[in-house]
């Protein structure tokens, strides 16, 4: 057998050889005619004759990896230590804040200048909130609560039906615009819808700011419509519990709940009581038939 063929076959079946240099580590595998190909490499440079060159790997890479692991572990320990200290400080702050909140609740002080007080329709409020003067000379507005739960729901229905919302306006100096905080009609600090002003009503867009010119474009008829619908709904809530149309009323013509006076309501209630007493007396009367002797 030819010696060249033997050497060629030996190169094809040879194991990868690890060549260690002073500055770099290279892995080679003989591939035909002495060409070199790098094994397990992420990137490779291609030479002019088309053969791939091995990527140089620094000897200090292993040391760098271990150094990074050690650094990360030390950083994690420091972060955990700082986090534990922070939690202890945060607990102390929470205790102080709880004491401050309890004091402010008894004194009636407001906790924030920007937040508006909101009330649920399911709860009744009969007392007026009168905040005391704080150290910062902040005067919170006195909120007068509506007297009835039905009035609250009537106001909310009125708001949804008209697509309007009440706004509280404060000046924003850096933008030279009016910052508008939205609140519902039931949270208005007024006793009656008659005290409602034109500036409080506008077709709303959420998360927007309005200028003075935009607020000036609100018309009087919108306010009148709000008041009218509010009064009608309030009457609806008051009368719907006492007036019920019967089948005879439906045949003769449905009774309009909004045009019935309170005197008529009292008369109908008294008539019903008289009818009930008459029925009871008729039931108590019994006829006794004595047998006749022959």
From Swiss-Prot:
Entry annotated with the keyword Manganese: no
Report biased composition (Acidic residues) as residue ranges: 86-139, 260-283
- List where Basic and acidic residues composition bias occurs: 242-259
Keywords, in A-Z order = Coiled coil
Q: Which domain of life does the UniProt lineage start with? A: Viruses
Q: Does the keyword Coiled coil apply?
A: yes
**Which residues lie within the region annotated Disordered?**
25-59, 77-141, 242-294
Q: Where do the coiled-coil regions begin and end? A: 201-234
Transmembrane stretches, by residue range?
Answer: none
Write down what this protein is called. Uncharacterized protein ORF90
The organism of origin for this protein? Ostreid herpesvirus 1 (isolate France)
